[in-house]
Design a protein with these regions (language model features):
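A glycosyltransferase accessory/donor-loop signature
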Residues: 1-3, 8-9, 166-315
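A recurrent flexible, glycine/aromatic-enriched loop bordering the glycosyltransferase active site
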Residues: 148-158
């Protein structure tokens, strides 16, 4: 049976979604087979679906599904939450044929084979995820959620989901109910906070390279990183981490590891690229970045800035 990977996106987010999917396919072990499931706000045109399917030049995806989500979420939830976050909550109900599935945000570039994740025994745990580090405003935020251990707060952009157990405990309904309470109005990251509250104590920690968020890269945050992870984990993130653009988006301008996104974007078919306008300045910056001498100087300056910031922090 192919391994189910789920993504959610709107029609105006087809380009980032396609870029993420291409990175998943190109990084897969040749013996891996995936079932790619797209939860979309409205039906994609047949031509766009075909272009997306055409990304698989390696025969990695044995099945593609495009699920029209229009009308599946009560209108009361719109306006307060992103469409994608609401669709993600319904995954356990949408995929009754699977006991486990992997969900990814569409602002991630995958640089690892994902099939090994499906060999993890989740037991009675609900989720597998990457824990966020305690830095800055995160510290007070995580504590405000009244978790027994605030160091066990995961980023919900990359989730190994125990669908069988989630269905057993009616997790989707609990999520929707929580998001309609007064308490939820104080959540900084609504559905992510809800996942952490409801699944707390039933989460398996995944290696950080599976979901390398922005704060896993600058040296200024390394001390906080090492309170949760090891130096080997730090090296793995920087060598081959799945880059999650949790803040600045590379198609809009400069972002940490922005070139990784463009490495895949440039290989999309033109008919897909036309679905969204990307920043011309960001594209020019990428071309400079890839120029042997100029690019190396530019990268060296950014690294020096990062090092200087870290040194000043320690003084």
């Amino acid at each position: 049976m192919p391994l189910p990977i789920v993504v959610c996106y709107t029609t105006n987010f087809v380009v980032p979604a396609a870029t993420t999917l291409l990175s998943i396919i190109e990084s897969a072990d040749p013996n891996t087979t995936y079932h790619i499931i797209s939860l979309v706000e409205a039906p994609l045109s047949p031509s766009i679906e075909q272009r997306i399917k055409g990304l698989d030049k390696r025969g990695i995806v044995s099945k593609w599904s495009f699920i029209d989500m229009s009308g599946r979420v009560p209108s009361a939830y719109f306006g307060s939450f992103s469409i994608g976050s609401l669709y993600r909550i319904l995954i356990p109900k949408l995929l009754p044929e699977y006991d486990t599935a992997l969900y990814l945000d569409c602002d991630i570039i995958v640089q690892n084979d994902l099939s090994k994740l499906f060999s993890i025994d989740l037991g009675e745990n609900l989720l597998g995820g990457v824990r966020e580090t305690l830095i800055g405003a995160n510290i007070d935020h995580f504590k405000s959620l009244e978790l027994n251990d605030p160091t066990w707060y995961i980023n919900s952009g990359f989730l190994l989901m125990n669908l069988k157990e989630m269905r057993r405990v009616n997790f989707s309904k609990k999520m929707m109910d929580l998001l309609q309470t007064e308490r939820a109005k104080s959540f900084v990251f609504p559905d992510q906070d809800a996942y952490n509250i409801l699944a707390h104590g039933k989460i398996i920690s995944l290696p950080p390279y599976y979901n390398s968020i922005r704060t896993f890269y600058p040296s200024i945050y390394k001390d906080a990183f090492l309170k949760l992870y090891t130096n080997d984990d730090w090296k793995a993130v920087h060598r081959h981490g799945n880059v999650h653009y949790t803040s600045a988006k590379p198609w809009k301008g400069y972002a940490i590891q922005f070139d990784k996104w463009w490495d895949y974007y440039i290989h999309l078919p033109e008919s897909l690229k036309q679905q969204m306008e990307v920043s011309k300045k960001a594209h020019k910056l990428y071309n400079i970045w890839k120029t042997p001498i100029i690019g190396q100087i530019f990268q060296g300056l950014l690294k020096a800035k990062d090092t200087l910031t870290t040194l000043l922090k320690k003084k």
